[in-house]
């Protein structure tokens, strides 16, 4: 279930402020953020965000296809390394 249309999309104020400052100065520096919950606005296109995944900051370059999604969708929090093969135990039986 999505967010109510009358509320509008959510973005943290400090994040929007940083993007606006860089757009005024025509800069494209990496913006470090912990705000995974912020919605990607059209103003964010072309910027790179370092989104925190709980362990490190993952660089996310924003393209036009990402508008409307959340920043956290592009920085996975879990890493699956695969199941361990326990062939030795199964062969003994």
From Swiss-Prot:
Domain of life: Bacteria
UniProt GO molecular function: rRNA binding; structural constituent of ribosome
Record keywords, A-Z: Ribonucleoprotein, Ribosomal protein, RNA-binding, rRNA-binding
Pfam families: Ribosomal_S19
GO CC terms of this entry: cytoplasm; small ribosomal subunit
Keyword RNA-binding: yes
UniProt KW Plastid keyword: no
GO biological process: ribosomal small subunit assembly; translation
Function (record text): Protein S19 forms a complex with S13 that binds strongly to the 16S ribosomal RNA.
Family that this chain belongs to: Belongs to the universal ribosomal protein uS19 family.
Record-given protein name: Small ribosomal subunit protein uS19
Species this chain originates from: Brevibacillus brevis (strain 47 / JCM 6285 / NBRC 100599)
Gene name of the encoded protein: rpsS
């Amino acid at each position: 279930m999505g967010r109510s249309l009358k509320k509008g999309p959510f973005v943290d104020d400090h994040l929007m402020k940083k993007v606006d400052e860089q757009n005024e100065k025509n800069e494209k520096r990496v913006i470090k953020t912990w705000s995974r919950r912020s919605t990607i606005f059209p103003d964010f296109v072309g910027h790179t965000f370092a989104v925190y995944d709980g362990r490190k900051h993952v660089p996310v370059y924003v393209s036009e296809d990402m508008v409307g999604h959340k920043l956290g969708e592009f920085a996975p929090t879990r890493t699956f390394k695969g199941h361990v093969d326990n062939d030795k135990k199964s062969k003994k039986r």
